[in-house]
């Protein structure tokens, strides 16, 4: 999936681990990811969490699409921070996924919740 995901590549997202029902990603905040306050734009954290959610849901074997997603920001993210997103399937056959986002100091910076729609199409 990552090989076709140009947006995740553009963000510099790196896969740390991916297996059935689990994914962990990272990204380092560069100058072009900051807002007018020289902090990471909120969309960067959201996008990392969204990609982590998508990779986790699709790792289950069926092509999945996002039905809904939301994020709560807990801490600011600064230039040169490395942020991590970790997602695991909560319950077998569940379509609700939680993604925890934290920084290199292991401080939780955001909570993301996504609801997936699973299609009948298999991932090849």
Predicted regions, residues:
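Compact, glycine-rich, soluble single-domain proteins
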Residues: 37-54, 58
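Beta-strand residues in well-ordered beta-sheet regions across diverse protein folds
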Residues: 26-28, 86, 98-100
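A generic structural signal for short beta-strands and their flanking turns/coil linkers
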Residues: 9-11, 21-23, 65-69, 81, ...
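HotDog/MaoC-like acyl-thioester-processing domains
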Residues: 78-79, 89-124
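Hydrophobic beta-strand-centered segment that forms part of the acyl-chain substrate-binding groove
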Residues: 54-83, 89-90
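Catalytic strand-loop segment that frames the active site of acyl-thioester-processing enzymes
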Residues: 7-40
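N-proximal, solvent-exposed amphipathic alpha-helical segments enriched in charged/polar residues
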Residues: 1-6
